[in-house]
Structure formats: C-alpha cells, structure tokens
C-alpha cells in the first residue's frame, strides 16, 4: 500500500494559510517519498452547516496548490458532533495508508502534546475548553494517542488566524454582493480566486440549506415523527410544535434558542431535520464504530443515552 501524508480540513475556501500548509506538507511528502492526500469534508462542514464552496471546487483548489490527491469524508457532520467524527476520520486515514498527519497551529507540538495528555488520561475528548488555544488540534492529537498513535503528528506555524479566517473571507464576499473585495484577494492564492470567480459566475456559491424541506418538516411533522429525529429532545419538540408556523431561518434559530440549544447543536439539529436523520441511524452508526474500537469509552452509545444528548427526555 502506498504510504500517505494526510491533511484534514474544510478549506472553505482555500486561502494562503492553507497554501502554506499544503506546500510544507508536500515538501515533507517528497522528503519521505510519500503521497500527499488532502481529506476534505463533503456534504456538511465540521460546523454542521452547508459549505460556502462545494466539494468539487475545493477539490480543485487543493490540487492546484500541489496536493497529489483529494479524498472526501462524507455523511458524518449532519449525524455526529465533531468530537465523534474526529476518531472516525483518523481511523479512515490510517486505513487508507496514512502514516503522517500535518496541521498548522500557533502553539508548538510540545504544547499540544502537554495539553492533550489530560484528555488522553481521562479518556474524555468531548469537553474541550473553549479558551484552549488550537483546541481542535489538541483534540486531534489526543484522539490519535487514544487510537495508539497510528499517525506521526507534524505541526507548522499558522498564519494570523484573525486575518486568514475562512469565516471572514466568506462574509466579505457575501457583504460585497458576491464580488471578491480587493483586500480579500490579497489573502487568496490566484488559483483560488480563479475558481471562486468561476463558481460565483455559475451561481454555485454560496451553498444553501434546503429550507423548503426544513420548513415543511418543522411545520407539519407530528410529535411522533419529530421524536424519531436525532438531537431533538422532548422540550425542543414541545417548543417546535408550540411556535409553528416557520417561514424564515430566524424563526427556526429562535425556537432552538428558546430550547436552550447553543449555535453548534442548533446547526446539527437543523441538519438532522433537513436530512431526516433518525436517532436509530445515529445509534447504529456509533455502534458500528464502537465495534471497531474507534470510539472512546466516554463517547459510547450508552454514555450518550445516559447524558440524553439525542434521546427525547420528556
């Protein structure tokens, strides 16, 4: 099997910080005589929402900057919270032949290792403190350790995260009537600009939710049907039924706020409604990975049921 150097990201879109990561990873791959593979999330982002740029365009952006191959992670982020998808993605890369994983961070690899040890020792990878710097990189490192360190971990210094922010880049384009602003162009490789402009001209950007289907389900589904959908507990279902009718996204965000959902769980719950993801579907998916010893003890199905994260409680 060909040995791989792996990157995992959304790249929505690919900016110059990502370009640096790809170039450094390619250099490492050449030194080790390995192949550089970029793994991109497809369908739904790690933030449980639709992508601004579709998979095919992000695929082309990564190849244009030197990746040897682009693979996809699909079917995860409308079904599972991020901390559950990370070990699944790590395992997939290892099964594909990856020996190394490279990422960028503004803290060193030693700092990442030190902060990760607490979570490895406790076997708890869910409650990563929000004030942790580069907490996603810490989570990936900790879960790699949990899986027996199948991947050698590499870290390069990241660009200014406030400046090279995919969220801010996307917002700047949306706020400028779908024209890439001059200042934003400075943050993007030329190949990304060319692909973005082609996608904008073709009307494929930004990606959108299927709001018509979401409104239909939230307005018409019986209590019994809503109870089958993942990430909706009893209190939330009561609020959904009580607050009907839904005609715009804000009315949907508002009902989840009333049910005390935070932004991340709101996006995941709305994605579950959009794709009609059932509690049983999530349970079966998690059990299939438990059987492969991919899921940490604290994240197994029974623990999730005990915490009532996606099982109706009322």
What are these regions (language model features)?
Residues 15, 62, 169:
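Residue-level signal for inorganic ion chemistry
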Residues 56-67:
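Short, structured active-site "lid" loops
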Residues 1-55:
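N-terminal catalytic cores of NTP/NDP-binding nucleotidyl/phosphoryl-transfer enzymes
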Residues 49-50, 65-314:
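Active-site cores that bind ATP or allylic diphosphates and position pyrophosphate for catalysis
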